[in-house]
Amino acid sequence: MEHLLSLLVRSVFIENMALAFFLGMCSFLAMSKKINAAIGLGIAVIVVQTVTVPANNLLLTYLLKEDALAWAGVTGVDLTFLSFISFIGVIAAIVQIMEMVMDKYMPALYNALGVFLPLITVNCVIMGGSLFMVERDYHFAESVVYGFGSGAGWAIAIVLLAGILEKMKYSDIPEGLRGLGITFITVGLMSLGFMSFGGISL
C-alpha cells in the first residue's frame, strides 16, 4: 500500500507528464485559455488514462507478451511487436465511447472541448502512460495507480496554467510576449516549481 501511495505521489508531482516530460503539449497549450475547458479536458484525460493504462496492461499480460497465451494452451508465441497498434486501438475505442457519453449527457462540455476530445486519441500523454507502464514493468494494481496519477498530474498542470493565464489577462504584458510567448515562459516557471518535488524522498 505504501508503495502504491509513493507511486501515486511520484506520478502526480515528481514525474508530471506535462511539466517533467512535456507530453501532451498541443492540447495543453491550446485548451489552457479558459479554466472551464481546462477542467473538462483534465477530467477527460484522467478518465481515459485511468482506464487505458490498466486495459493495456491486461492486453500485454494476457495476449501480447511472450508465452502470454499459455492460458489458452498456446506457447512460444511473442506478439509484443503488435503493442503499439493494439494500445492505439484500445485508446481509440475508449475515447470514442467517452465522446458518445459526453455528447449525450454533457453537450456543453462536449462543444467546449470541440476537436480536442477526439485528439485525446493521439495525445502523446495517453500513449506515453501506456509506454511508461510497459517500460517500468508495472503489474495491474500499479498500472491503475499510475494511470490515475499521471492523468491527474496532467490535469492539475493544465488547470493551474489556465488559472494563471486568466489572471494575466489583467496584466500589462509586453506586446512581443503576448500569446504563446508568455505562455511558454509561464510553463517553464511552473516546470521549475514542480522540479522542487524531485528532492522528496519516497
From Swiss-Prot:
Localization annotation: Cell inner membrane
Catalytic activity, EC: 7.2.1.1
Leader sequence segment: none
Coiled-coil parts of chain: none
GO BP: respiratory electron transport chain; sodium ion transport
Highest rank taxon of the organism: Bacteria
TM segment ranges: 11-31, 35-55, 81-101, 114-134, 144-164, 180-200
One GO cellular component term: plasma membrane
InterPro entries linked: NqrDE/RnfAE (IPR003667), NqrDE/RnfAE_oxidrdctase (IPR050133), NqrE (IPR010967)
Membrane topology reported for the UniProt record: Multi-pass membrane protein
Catalytic reaction equation(s): a ubiquinone + n Na(+)(in) + NADH + H(+) = a ubiquinol + n Na(+)(out) + NAD(+)
Role of this protein: NQR complex catalyzes the reduction of ubiquinone-1 to ubiquinol by two successive reactions, coupled with the transport of Na(+) ions from the cytoplasm to the periplasm. NqrA to NqrE are probably involved in the second step, the conversion of ubisemiquinone to ubiquinol.
NCBIfam families: nqrE
Annotated family: Belongs to the NqrDE/RnfAE family.
Protein's name in the database: Na(+)-translocating NADH-quinone reductase subunit E
